[in-house]
């Protein structure tokens, strides 16, 4: 749901974030359709398949049996999904805003590079942040309440899927004809640091949530 909240939030807050098209009265979307399709195919499908062979946790036999009436996705899980989705959207839009003129967190000028180039850079930033945030969330989602660092390297298939996804994301950003297809542009080393730093917020938020759950249970 991270991409859903990103698109919805980007459209609703476009004026505050600088996600606008000069001279146009239409809606300017934060991410393109091809980018959203890439996110769904790349960061959702491969890690999800790899998580299907994730080893069981050590405390699986200590858990209470589920009731026949229990839902597969209960209220608490929906809350977790919405919470992480909102965090993903927030860091994605903040990353975009940092590279747009007229936003909340920057005083950049459009004249320096031109609006189209600036929007492409911002979209590439948001696109990349969301991809890496989804990968980190896949690691965090291995357990509902255990830290991501417990058995971190137990699932080699998941790490393989993440490595492949990261490599393909780099290809989309640096191969010229894919730049045209996906509306991306090469990023600087500093931009990569920003992307990874903002994506890490998802992992930190997930770890804090799990700490609270463990404290409440004890």
Label each PLM-derived region with a short phrase.
Residues 52, 101, 128-218:
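C-terminal transmembrane module of polytopic membrane proteins
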Residues 1-145:
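Membrane-embedded transport module
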């Amino acid at each position: 749901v991270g991409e859903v909240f990103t698109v919805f939030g980007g459209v609703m807050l476009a004026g505050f974030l600088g996600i606008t098209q000069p001279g146009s009265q239409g809606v300017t979307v934060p991410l393109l359709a091809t980018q959203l399709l890439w996110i769904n195919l790349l960061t959702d499908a491969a890690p999800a398949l790899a998580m299907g062979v994730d080893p069981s946790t050590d405390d699986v036999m200590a858990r209470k049996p589920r009731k026949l009436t229990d839902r597969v996705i209960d209220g608490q899980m929906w809350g977790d999904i919405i919470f992480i989705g909102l965090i993903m959207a927030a860091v994605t839009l903040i990353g975009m805003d940092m590279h747009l003129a007229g936003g909340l967190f920057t005083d950049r000028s459009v004249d320096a590079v031109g609006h189209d180039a600036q929007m492409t850079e911002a979209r590439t930033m948001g696109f990349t942040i969301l991809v890496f945030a989804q990968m980190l969330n896949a690691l965090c989602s291995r357990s509902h309440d255990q830290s991501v660092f417990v058995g971190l390297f137990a699932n080699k298939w998941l790490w393989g899927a993440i490595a492949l996804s990261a490599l393909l994301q780099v290809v989309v950003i640096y191969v010229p004809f894919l730049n045209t297809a996906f509306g991306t542009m090469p990023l600087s080393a500093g931009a990569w640091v920003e992307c990874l730093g903002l994506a890490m917020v998802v992992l930190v938020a997930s770890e804090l949530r799990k700490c609270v759950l463990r404290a409440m249970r004890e």
